[in-house]
Amino acid sequence: MSLLVKICGLSTRETLETALDAGADMVGFVFFPPSPRHLSLELGRDLGRQVNRRALKVALTVDADDATLDNIMDALSPDIFQLHGKETVARLRDIKQRFGRPVMKAVPVATSADLAVLPGYAAVADRILFDARAPKDATRPGGLGAPFDWHLLENLDLNLPYMVSGGLHADNVAEALRITRAGGVDVSSGVESAPGVKDPEMIKAFIRAARATQDASQELSVR
């Protein structure tokens, strides 16, 4: 199975084009005002058109209501909704039924106890995204540049695709994949020169590093 690489929090035509040209499988757009990566609906519409089916469009939301999701659906027509708040299993089910789109549920991780929610979410979600749990005083749940203990996923038994995020960058993505055996990686702050400012060279370096890990793994498997 091919590794999925997601570049999240894209907000300019230049950096989106860089991610697409470099081979990102998923491009993420943030619709959450407290985030420095938040997009207006108008910009989301423009960037969505630019993607033009070259990657999967992911709309990141945090405890959004139906009206907000309706507007995002109209502007971006995302391929996937990434739910990064405290959405319940019932809420995931409602969103899937209302919009007919897959949902990826972010699960914040700090200790093994945080994994107790997985059976409930796994019954409804199409994919799980493991992210570092934000500090209690944080104004947003992700994109903070902090990793979690990847060894918590070392013996994970989850019959569902999952990705990892949180503090990833070109220099540690190989280690994250080796430990977690995740089917995908998601990066935001790890390809930025400042909060919300994506760096084209860092985007390309991250995707190269992730792909190199995949290539090395495939080479070992055929020996």
From Swiss-Prot:
The keyword Transmembrane does not apply. InterPro entries: Aldolase_TIM, PRAI_dom, RibuloseP-bd_barrel, TrpF_fam. The keyword Secreted does not apply. One of its GO terms (biological process) is L-tryptophan biosynthetic process. It catalyses: N-(5-phospho-beta-D-ribosyl)anthranilate = 1-(2-carboxyphenylamino)-1-deoxy-D-ribulose 5-phosphate. SUPFAM superfamilies: Ribulose-phoshate binding barrel. Pathway: Amino-acid biosynthesis; L-tryptophan biosynthesis; L-tryptophan from chorismate: step 3/5. One of its GO terms (molecular function) is phosphoribosylanthranilate isomerase activity. Keywords: Amino-acid biosynthesis, Aromatic amino acid biosynthesis, Isomerase, Tryptophan biosynthesis. PANTHER family: N-(5'-PHOSPHORIBOSYL)ANTHRANILATE ISOMERASE. Belongs to the TrpF family. This is N-(5'-phosphoribosyl)anthranilate isomerase. The gene is trpF.
